[in-house]
Amino acid sequence: MASSLDSAALTLSNLSINGDFASSLPNLQKNLHLLSPQQVELAKILLELGQSHLFEHWAEPGVDDNEKKAFFDQVARLNSSYPGGLASYIKTARGLLADSKEGKNPFDGFTPSVPTGEVLTFGDDSFVSFEDRGVREARKAAFVLVAGGLGERLGYNGIKVALPAETTTGTCFLQSYIEYVLALREASNRLAGESETEIPFVIMTSDDTHTRTVELLESNSYFGMKPSQVKLLKQEKVACLDDNEARLAVDPHNKYRIQTKPHGHGDVHALLYSSGLLKNWHNAGLRWVLFFQDTNGLLFKAIPASLGVSATREYHVNSLAVPRKAKEAIGGITRLTHTDGRSMVINVEYNQLDPLLRATGFPDGDVNNETGYSPFPGNINQLILELGSYIEELSKTQGAIKEFVNPKYKDATKTSFKSSTRLECMMQDYPKTLPPSARVGFTVMDTWVAYAPVKNNPEDAAKVPKGNPYHSATSGEMAIYRANSLVLRKAGVKVADPVEQVFNGQEVEVWPRITWKPKWGLTFSEIKSKINGNCSISPRSTLVIKGKNVYLKDLSLDGTLIVNADEDAEVKVEGSVHNKGWTLEPVDYKDTSVPEEIRIRGFRINKIEQEERN
């Protein structure tokens, strides 16, 4: 023991420690014999980084010794999970905190302009052609779901991906996503004349969601995917910062822990890089990586065409986007050109875009053009990256994404914080480090077909000004029925107009409750090919299609029809179907006798009568 104590003491005495640290060292010095050489190295790093305060409250040897070792386990984790380690984290933090204190504008020197991209109209020839190309490319793609969040903000205590996307079938978001990927795989392999290729599916989890995500997958047999296709990558939190010197915050509940908070979904890039998956995919001939977030029930309707755009235009980065009203609370995709010649195409948050435009020769700021929309399309955080250039970029950055810091200051002097802060990063900021030669574009699709996130609880949604999107479980479910109704309309079905109803204080359009499995209708041309004759669906109807080869011909539906078909069975659905159907019954979100996932919608489905065809 004496020799390890001597060597540890020697290591510490070799440090160039100035007087500032002296007061904190006795507590550490007394405990050095407890530490391994690696832990002594970590202590050395912390002292060199000006973090001696972390040891000020350490007890005498023999008291809390296990907690002291656990402290270094945490430090080792924080050091290894961040590109460049804690030294890099603290150096970056000091720079960003100094900029924040000075009020530096990250956009100084940049002039915004409208980038180039593809604006698609659902169902026209160009759209159909891009969809076809996208399905062909899908077997060369990997899908990455960023799912680190709980549903607390929604008034739901589970993980967000376990929430039903719609309650007609009760299909949760994760099941819906996996079934779309499986349908894409099957369709893409069929076009390529082979059946072996599997599409990789990665889920980024967090401490909050990891175990429950595993349980959801395992208890549902991975929703039909092979377990080997699915990889979970868990993101670690980052250290909190107490002041402008980036002193690490001590956890208020345990003096032997550093307080930590989530770093943001930008971590997905570093996790993919360190996992080795990207190289494996590249060696297997993959070309694309698609990133998407956890609660948008429409996004896969937009993916085939967007992937087709990436392949046709040879984009290194393709951001999916929707038309955006000027000043709408959604980031705008913008080209920024610096006075030094640098340029990049990135998402600029809506509260930064208007002042940036006003400051750079656009006196009116962010305004709608002749189309009725802002020329800067709305970012919906779904990205398609070309794998080769992605690997090339990450080999330079190790997946580190340009970060930001958002301290809440106590007063105008900006010398102290109301509470600890931390560095954050966003997945969509990946293009910030790309060279000007990178081909960065976007694909715009109508909101009704591409974007219906579920992120607000009923109380917050009810306060949203009329005409603005609620982004609640209520509006998210109604958006799925609306999209499916409009797709069938475009395919020639007479779908009745919606009726207005109020649930949980939100006025929504209630369309016929139409749902289908992805394998029935992955693309518009496929859906169109399965509809013949004169079909009509009344406003109170529900149509559920669970099968691939289901054909609608001269169907008149007024009520509820569920069509179940085995994999290879061909089912023709014809004639008139009339029954009492299923109704929507309002429920109050405060009624705790109703399950959370139902009451946050404000309605439950009352299944009175239906016809099933098998």
UniProtKB/Swiss-Prot annotation:
Catalytic activity field: a monosaccharide 1-phosphate + UTP + H(+) = a UDP-monosaccharide + diphosphate
Q: Which PANTHER family match?
A: UDP- GLUCOSE PYROPHOSPHORYLASE, UDP-SUGAR PYROPHOSPHORYLASE
- Membership in a protein family: Belongs to the USP family.
Q: What does this protein do?
A: May function as the terminal enzyme of the myo-inositol oxidation (MIO) pathway. May also play a role in the salvage pathway for synthesis of nucleotide sugars. Can convert galactose-1-phosphate into glucose-1-phosphate by carrying out both the Gal-1-P conversion to UDP-Gal and, following an epimerase step, the subsequent reverse reaction of UDP-Glc to Glc-1-P.
Task: Enumerate the UniProt keywords alphabetically.
Answer: Nucleotidyltransferase, Transferase
Report what the protein is called.
UDP-sugar pyrophosphorylase
This chain's source organism reads Cucumis melo (Muskmelon)
Checking InterPro entries in the record gives: Nucleotide-diphossugar_trans, UDP-sugar_pyrophosphorylase, UDPGP_fam
- Among its keywords, does the record have Nucleotidyltransferase? yes
What EC number(s) is this enzyme filed under? 2.7.7.64
**What's an example of a GO molecular-function annotation for this chain?**
UDP-N-acetylglucosamine diphosphorylase activity
Q: What class of enzyme is it?
A: transferase
Signal peptide coordinates:
none
Write down the Pfam families for this protein, in alphabetical order: UDPGP (PF01704)
Q: Please list the cofactors this protein needs.
A: Mg(2+); Mn(2+)
For this chain's UniProt record, which GO biological process terms are given? UDP-N-acetylglucosamine biosynthetic process
